[in-house]
Amino acid sequence: MGTFAARRPLLRRSLLMVGLLLAATACSSVRSDQASAPGVPGEPSASPSSKPSAPPSPKPGAKDAEVFDSRDFVVVVAKPGDTAEGLAARHLGDPHKKWMIEDYMGVRTFSEGQEVVIPKREWNPGGVFPWGYQLVPVLVYHRISAENEGKLSIGVRHFEAQMRSLHAEGFRAVSLADFLEFTAGRRQLPRKSVVLTFDDGHRSFIQYARPLLKDFGFNATLFVYSDFIGAGSGLSWSDLRALITQGFDVQAHSKTHGNLRRKEDESQAAYARRIESELAYPLDLFRKHLGRAADTLAYPYGDTDEEVLRHVVKYGYVAAFTVRRQSNPAFVFPLKISRSQIYSEMTPKDFARNLTVFQDQEVGTARTSDGKLAGSSGAARAQPVATAAAAPPVPWARDRLAASHNERAEQLEQRGHLRQALEERAIALTINPGDRRAQEAQKRLEGRTAQEVAGLLKEGRALLGRGLLGEAQQRFLVALSLDPTNRTAFETLQNEVREVMSIVHTVRSGDTCPSVAELYYGDRLRCEVIVETNRLALNVPLRPGQKLKIPEIPGVPFQLR
């Protein structure tokens, strides 16, 4: 999947939280632009099935009523000069929330006269849609230096080019705190989000990385191992305190950077002492020097196992990162979050391969209103038919504008796309809150959706009991696509359903780990995933006839040429 290519959402918008949609019937009002200036443009609404009757004579000032407002939405008409940033400041109270408008409408620029629907709250914290789910890449750097000085020491010009490309392609470097809220199912992130991390704690971060990150407005987290702090080329505690005041985050990377897995000849007692030193001692130092403990860990070498996980939980870490080269869904297991290491020899194309932001996957089969399977799997991806830019909706055109959303809701429900149909009903009721017919249709649709979700959860639980994890995962994904805030579906996906599809590869003469990675992933650097999955020793040749498990990577389809 092309990660730098601009991806227009396959439906014009996704649904606000199902449980909140009834609020649209209670709080709707129309404001003049004298009270609140109008909003953003996006796609024009579908044309109504019939022309409106002749309009009554507008009352004085009525021609300015171009903003429809409810608890969940603001519907506006774009005026010259409107931008997402300005509209976010005006209607959401924060210009930095412009991403909500851009992601919801699927565009970054607007034209005069277009209808714009602005969500007033995050509408899909899990990022699960009928056609797939959102992924967030986490990148890990080590040392940034004047020039490339080795695989893990990246020259500042190389680093600047990578940051510039992220910025140019519309990526937003979100904070670790926001990302962890996303992985808890409590925070929606921009469609093109990335998390930037820096391991070990090199002092060169201040000279080379910090200025560029500030220039591009990017957040970053430093994972430091405590024995390196204040030693040699490491950052000092005062450096770390200063970086925190500047908006950077600092978390733990163990005490000595030793592998946390138990050694073959290590006794249980010796291992217990060592793991306590590696995991607990840094927490004490954080409290002493930074005024708070770390709550997130980057495993040295990205290596962990079930025994390590138990100790990580014991010492109070809530999230931990590997170096598995893949992006993360919201429901990733929080103690095995993946990161992709960035190397000095990477080309721009290599770098881009680490920025996958969506997993294309039909998460469920839509059903029509009579319960039959929808005729085309592509129906879930179809966008409503749009017409030329609509004229600004003066009050007498309110019914016509609302009717277009009600008509679209009926079409979507017939195709079996219940969540998208609910969304259109809620928007229609934002525009015309007194529409009894739309209110009744919304209530009926909410009941049908709730019934569908309950059935999916029951099916998923039964499949889990039979050990059919892949099929169970599908049911819970569909439930989450219908109800984005369903905690049962989210927590089951995160904690109980961890099946990864894989292919068994039989090693042939001449095969190497990089060549096998190239065969299946189209990327030789994904060899790291094969090594981790199969617990291979580094630099040991593969044996003809050897069986390798090749795991599926979210957002990276198997090549298989």
Question: What annotation goes with each model-predicted range?
Answer:
Residues 24-26:
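C-terminal motif of bacterial Sec signal peptides marking the signal peptidase cleavage site
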Residues 134-147, 169-172, 182, 190-194, ...:
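Metal-dependent polysaccharide deacetylase catalytic core of the NodB/CE4 family, i.e.
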Residues 58-68, 86, 90-131, 427-448, ...:
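Extracellular LysM carbohydrate-binding repeats and other cell-envelope/extracellular binding modules
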Residues 63-95, 398, 403-412, 449-450, ...:
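Primarily a LysM-type cell-wall glycan-binding module
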Residues 28-30:
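Bacterial signal peptide processing site
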Residues 57, 63-64, 114, 120-194, ...:
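N-terminal pre-catalytic segment of deacetylase/amide-hydrolase enzymes
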